[in-house]
Structure formats: structure tokens, C-alpha cells
Amino acid sequence: MTLALLGAGAIGLAVGVPWGATLIGRDRVLTPIAAGGLRLTDARTDRTFGPDAIRTAGPEALASADLIAVATKSTALPSVIQTITAHARPHTPILSLLNGLSPVRDLAAALPNPILRGMIPFNAVWHGPAHLHLSSTGSVAVEDHEATATLPQVERRADMEALQHGKLLLNLINPINALSGLFLHAMLSDGSWRRLYAATLTEALQVYDMAGLAFTKAGPIPPRL
């Protein structure tokens, strides 16, 4: 299977390089990676991928891809749609790795391609021009489909929409953390900020219940605890 990854930034590289994807992104990011390889670290592992494991290309590579993974920012989605329309075959499945619920709907509304859901459980931070550190461990979750059957190190699931609803609940902590101006551990050690997060989560769960939206936990703790 030929896999192309559109949006080879920090998250895209953290996922696409271990997958053996053809990477499509900005030259300033990809040039040092192509020349010297990529180091990926997390709390438990330290992996190095040499230059021979890095494949880069322009958007024309989408034409021969059997699966296209999208890992851009959500704000770049209009440009992504234009690029896919211009270069990809209309039947090639698109795997959306973007945060939020709307990217999958927007891609499906704009493209004839099958649109698959994916979810990345970690963040990736640059520790140098060719070194990415992952904030946590965990497998990328992808929709169970014949196009994702050979992707390595993933969790194939039939409940991706419910999982994305759960990830949205998990992400509610991010704006509160930004407002606090504290490191996450320090914020969670403060009862006032914990109560604010709990109130936000309670309101979100009420909205889900009223809308009849199913969700499954996207982290180690169920949101209703």
C-alpha cells in the first residue's frame, strides 16, 4: 500500500515516519529531516529513523497514493481540499487525523473520496530541528476499514465517532490550562482550577445527553467520574 501524508509538521512526522508514509509538507521542516533523519522520543522510548527511512514529495504524490492521511491544522482545510481535488484520485480514501468533529464533515461535503476518522492521543514538541518528543504514549486510533488494515502501530476501531466525542471532552482542559497560565500538573493541584474544569465537563456532558451524542473515554479516566 502506498500511503501519502499531507501536512508533515510535528504531528504529521510523528505519525507518518513510523508508518513509512510519503511526506508532503513545508521544505523548511522536511529538508533537515530528509538530510539527517528523525529522532522520536517519549517517556519510554527513543527511536531514530535514518534518512533512508524518510520519503518526501510534492502534492503530485497524491495521485499514486492508496491512502491519504491529513495531519494539517484545521484552519488549512480549505487548502487541503483544493490540493486533494487537484491531485488525488476521487476514490482514494482520506484519513483525517485532525482534531475536532467538523473536519470529517467538511471533507465529506467537499470531496467524493471516502473519508475515514482518526485520532491522535498525544502531542509532539520540537526539541531540535530533527528531534520530536511526544507528550504521552498511546496508539493512534483509526477507523476500521480495508484501507487502514496494514497501518502499523494503530488501534482499529468501529466506534471512531464516539471516540472523537470523548476526545473533545478531554480537550476541554486545554483552554482552562491556557487561562490558568500554569503547567498542567500545577493547575490540577489547585482545587479552584479543578472545580472549573469539572463544571465545564459537567456542562459538556449535559449538552451531549440532550443531543443524544454517544461518547467513549479517550483517556484513562471516564469523563463522568
What are these regions (language model features)?
Residues 193-225:
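Small-residue-rich helix-loop
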Residues 99-182:
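Rossmann-fold dinucleotide-binding core
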